[in-house]
Amino acid sequence: MDNTSKVHKLMELAELARLPRRKEVEGAVIVIKVGGHAMVDPAARSSIIKDIVTLRELGALPVIVHGGGPEIDAMVKRMGMTPSFVAGIRVTDDETLEIVRMVLVGNVSPDIVSLIMRHGGKGVGLLGSSGSLLIARKKPMEKVKVDGKEIMVDYGWVGDTEQVNTSILMDLLDKGYIPVISPIGYDRDGHCLNLNADTVAGDIASALKAGSLVSLTDVNGVMMDPSDKSTLLSHLTEKECEDLIERGIISRGMIPKIRSSLCVLKAGAHSVHIINGNIEHALLLELLTEKGVGTRLTLK
């Protein structure tokens, strides 16, 4: 970074320091789930990571959990397979698990870490086996309602987080790093499991007693009508979320996102935010201004 760039950066930080909620992020752990769809566009991806590095420079302690849905789907199709989902969860057989590992650990995570470095931060990629970060258990078969009918579903090599080793994350945060976590866990017998990135972000936020959880997606937030941006719901309580799920307004992949968000709030987080990562500086606007740009969830 040359001297001119450094001066511009200092001026930018000074402006951000005057925003209404700047003090709320200082010293706070902020878990940021970056969705695969929000990271497809290279310019948006770079902007998101730049804002995360800026939060670190403002005194926040960001932790990134990334997905990779579009990239995984593309590779699955390239291998002549068809992506399979039930209730927003990817059904993961042996071949799909190998693709998930290859894409997340080999492509998505290194790309995010390199962008952090490019914007002046220090990133480090992690997965469940890194210092036993994510101990998981295989998801059992369960009854799921599909098209009005209950069916038994075997998700394959899909897991739920059982334990989060927070010490490795806190050590990295204390040393100035931004952890970048791939949602791949291991059970106590060493079997690899595909984890839902939204759920992992929630589990990590709960374990770290994070101040906020932010989910960056390719939608503006929770909307009464997904095709009409004017129906964005800027604030929702737990009761309102449950009602919208029951009515089918919150559906598909948004359900695990909301469920994990509510668990994070019950664990002590002040707020959870669902925002569109394709909006320029959405992360900073949501966390540092009163109005925000997406949907803010609170218990009451």
UniProtKB/Swiss-Prot annotation:
UniProt keyword terms in alphabetical order: Amino-acid biosynthesis, Arginine biosynthesis, ATP-binding, Cytoplasm, Kinase, Nucleotide-binding, Transferase
GO molecular function, one term: ATP binding
Function comment: Catalyzes the ATP-dependent phosphorylation of N-acetyl-L-glutamate.
Catalyzed reactions per annotation: N-acetyl-L-glutamate + ATP = N-acetyl-L-glutamyl 5-phosphate + ADP
Site (Transition state stabilizer) location in chain: K33, K257
Protein name (database record): Acetylglutamate kinase
Family, per entry: Belongs to the acetylglutamate kinase family. ArgB subfamily.
Domain of life of the native organism: Archaea
A GO cellular component annotation in the UniProt record: cytoplasm
Pathway(s): Amino-acid biosynthesis; L-arginine biosynthesis; N(2)-acetyl-L-ornithine from L-glutamate: step 2/4
Coiled-coil zones: none
UniProt source species: Methanocella arvoryzae (strain DSM 22066 / NBRC 105507 / MRE50)
GO terms under biological process: arginine biosynthetic process via ornithine; L-arginine biosynthetic process
Cell compartments where the protein resides: Cytoplasm
Gene: argB
Residues given in the record as substrate binding sites: G68, G69, R90, N194
